[in-house]
Amino acid sequence: MSTEFWIAQAFNGISYGALLFLLASGLSLIFGVMRIVNLAHGSYFMLGGYVGLTVALRTTSFTLACLAAAVAIALVGMGMERFFLRRLHGQVLGQVLMTIGFALIFQDLALLIWGGDPYTVPIPALLTGTTRLGGAVFPIYRIFIVGVATVVGLALWLVLDRTRVGAMIRAAVDDAEMAQGVGINVPRVSLAVFALGAALAALGGVIGGGFLGVYPGADFEVLPYAFVVVIVGGLGSLPGAMVGSLLVGLLDNFGKALFPELSYFTLFAPMALILALRPTGLFGRA
């Protein structure tokens, strides 16, 4: 196999990992703060793609599509947390059943509104085509995805590590009861984190819809990858989500390219090995 093959597969894996980071970072923070296993998180990705598709077709603005999807799905997430999931605090089975129910409802609503055909979110002409870097050819749109994920990752790091809001979020992740005891409004922090996680997933849905497409069932296809990222990286850890996304993207892409009949093994076997050595994940804490 040529050097170009390895470079192309590595870059494809990195760009897919960047997309997974948009989905998994919010999922990780939601679990870290609220201890909720949100099985409807993939639905935010799918619905974000559909909302972005609709706005992009009506306005021809990709930027507006991303913003509209993020805001709309953030409001959906806030409604779920405030009126449903908050009432099930500490009830893991109830949360799982509730979020599965929402995932199925969202999928049926998507089918009812947009039908069962696959769509591709229109992207700006500026992001189409390829460019040559160091003798290798790279799709411009995938470079854009890596850039967006990098900016989002840096912004999240700055907020979490350098601001008072970030300090409150980190306190809630470490010990919600203690944070509540020192005057932090944990329910409000939880609501904000849930909205942020939903918005990031929706942004990923719009951006992913530009090359993966938007279709019914996309939510359940991408959700297992997000959970693998969160489990490998460590629950509630932003650096863990970054590293986990990169690992999962590379393993999945190389696994499908080199061992298509064993692609799931090449993804889940390393996850099992990591958990055997570090049950809390690479960056998780007991």
Report each predicted region and the residues it spans.
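Transmembrane helix-bundle core of multi-pass membrane transporters
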Residues: 10, 87-162, 189, 254, ...
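Membrane-interfacial amphipathic/re-entrant helices at transmembrane-helix boundaries
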Residues: 1-22, 51, 62-64, 91-96, ...
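Helix-loop-helix "hairpin" substructures at the membrane interface of multi-pass membrane proteins
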Residues: 16-17, 22, 136-214, 238-243
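Transmembrane alpha-helical segments in multi-pass inner-membrane proteins
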Residues: 20, 60-71, 191-201, 205-271, ...
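Alpha-helical transmembrane segments within multi-pass membrane transporters and channels
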Residues: 60-103, 109, 243-248, 278-279
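Cytosolic-side transmembrane-helix boundaries in multi-pass membrane proteins
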Residues: 5, 94, 113, 174-181, ...
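Short, non-helical or kinked segments that cap or interrupt transmembrane helices
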Residues: 25-49, 90-95, 165-168, 186, ...
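Membrane-embedded helix boundary and interhelical linker motif in transport proteins
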Residues: 11, 33-79, 83
